Amino acid sequence: GMRQHGKVSEVTEKKTAVYVDDQQRILIRQLARSWLWRSELPTWLLFVTVYGGWFACVAGWRTLGLFPATLLLIWFTAWYMSLQHELIHGHPTRLAWFNQLLGTLPLAVWYPYGVYRDSHLAHHRNHLLTHPEDDPESYYVTAESWQRFSAWQRRLIHLRNTFWGRLLLAPLMDIVHTLRSALRAFREGDHRAIAMWSLHLLLLTGLLAWMAAQGLSPLWFVLAVSYPALALTKVRSFLEHRAADDPLARSVINEAGLPWRVLFLNLNYHAVHHDLPGVPWYALRQLYLHRQTAYLQRNQGFLVRGYGEWRRHFSRRAVAVNAHPGFGEQAQAGGEHG
C-alpha cells in the first residue's frame, strides 16, 4: 500500500502545483482551510449519489422501464469514472488505500482501478504530456510507427480522429489494449497485476450475477450501458491535449455547458486541472473564472466553447492527431519543470 500511496501523494502534493501567481496561491491556501475543502462534503455527496443511483437503477429497472433505466445507467456509469478520477487525485481522503477501496467496484466493467490509476498518474507528468511513448493517455503515435502503419491502420486512426469515430472506435481500441496488457501480465507472471485482475474479475462476476438476479441481462449492460458510458468519456478527451512545445499550452480550456460540467466534474477546465492536480473538482470552475485571462494566455488560446464545437468541426473532418511532431528546444530545455 505505501508504494501506491507515495505515487498518489506525489501527484497531489503542493510541489507539483503550478500557480498562476501569488494571489492565486493565497486564495487556494484559504480555500484549503475552508470547512468545505476540509470536510470534502461535495465529494462524499457525489459518492453517495453515484453509488445510490447506479444500484437503484439496476434494482428498479422494471419500474423505470428498460430504456429510461439504460439511459440513467449510462449517466451513472460515466459519472462513476469521473469519481474514480477524483479518488486517484487524493479525494475525499488523504489515504490512497481507502480511496482505492471506494473506487474498486467494477461498475464500468473494463478497467481495474489500479490500471486506471497507474496510467493516469503517468499521464500527469506535464513535461511528457502528449508524448506517445511516455503519456499512456496520448492519441498521438510516434513518427516511426506512423511510417510503419499500413493504409488500413492509417485509415483507422483517421476515423478515430473524427468526433463520431472517436466515440465509436476509441473505447473498443482501449478495451483491446487493456485486455492484451492483462494477458501479458498473466503470461509473464506479474504478481501484482495478476492479483489486481483476479480481484477485478471476482468482483465483476459477483456484480453481474447480482444484476442477472435482478433480471437485467449482463450482456445488455456491457453492450448498451458500459460501452456507451466509455464513449461519453471520449467526448471529454476528444481534443483535450495537443502537442505544443510549452507544456502549459498542451491542455484545453473547454467552456462547456452545465450538464457536461456536472458529468465530467469540471475537467473541461483541463488546463487548470493539469496545473493544480490536487485541487478538488468543485473548485476548478471558480479558479478558472478568477484567472480567466491568465489561463488563456498561458495555454496560448487553446479554448473551445463547448463540446458542440468539436462535434460541428470534426463530424466529417479528422483532427490532426497522428504522428507526434516532437517538442521544440524550449520544451527540451524546460523539460523537467512541467
Task: List where the protein language model places each region.
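Active-site recognition of the HExxH zinc-binding catalytic motif
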Residues: 85-90, 120-124
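Glycine-/proline-rich flexible loop or hinge segments
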Residues: 81-89, 99-106, 270
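Generic hydrophobic, aliphatic-rich segments that mediate packing or membrane embedding
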Residues: 67, 83-84, 97-102, 116-119
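Membrane-interface elements of multi-pass transporters and channels
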Residues: 64, 87-95, 113, 179, ...
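Transmembrane alpha-helical segments that form the membrane-embedded catalytic/substrate-channel core
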Residues: 74-87, 112, 116, 163-171, ...
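Short active-site segment of divalent metal-dependent hydrolases/proteases
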Residues: 88-89, 127, 244, 264, ...
